[in-house]
Amino acid sequence: MSLFITFEGGEGCGKSTQSKALYRYLKKKGLGCVLTHEPGGSKSGDKITRLLKWSKEEHISPLTELLLFNASRSILIDNVIKPALQDGKIVICDRYTDSTLAYQGYGRGLDLDTVKCVNSLASGGLVPDLTIWLDMDDKAALLRKGELPPDRFESENNGFHQRVRNGFGAIYATEPDRFLKLDASLPQSEIFSRIKQRVTILLGCRNE
């Protein structure tokens, strides 16, 4: 039974922690499951990620970001996500098209319809069955990152991160049925309990 689940949110909201926890939980239940992430998730995609996050040699415009993120996405979908879904597996992806719309559209100010069009082209119209949005105050979330050196996006000003958060809110408002919105400031155990509950319901519906 194939299922496509994505995790979304700003920097430091706990997406990686919760996506890994869900992956381990589903594997223990004996379900075929694949855990991946954006940007990257493939050898070629990881090279693009390093350019996007850490390059300081050349200016990378918002449009270039949009195109590079979607080039990485297209590779990931063709080589990881689609094959796994075709095999009837559950795919968990840390970030997907909503992040691009929130960051490059709302955050960077690119035309939203253009971002949606490029996203759709690169993804082949593949839409998640469930998107888990971990929402948190951007300042508090960035404090979670600790003393690790910030990448190009983490080092952006508070205004940028607030626009990104508002962007996720706008996306959620247009497709609330696809989303599970959670307060990322809650204890990790409580967040995961709510995720398990929603995924269990979704799995039950798919098995009927």
Swiss-Prot record:
InterPro entries the record matches: P-loop_NTPase, Thymidylate_kin-like_dom, Thymidylate_kin_CS, Thymidylate_kinase
Molecular function (Gene Ontology), one example: dTMP kinase activity
One Gene Ontology cellular component: cytosol
Annotated EC: 2.7.4.9
PROSITE patterns to which the protein is assigned, alphabetical: THYMIDYLATE_KINASE
CDD domains: TMPK
Catalytic activity: dTMP + ATP = dTDP + ADP
Biological process per Gene Ontology, one example term: dTDP biosynthetic process
Similarity comment: family membership: Belongs to the thymidylate kinase family.
Role played: Phosphorylation of dTMP to form dTDP in both de novo and salvage pathways of dTTP synthesis.
Official protein name in the record: Thymidylate kinase
UniProt gene name: tmk
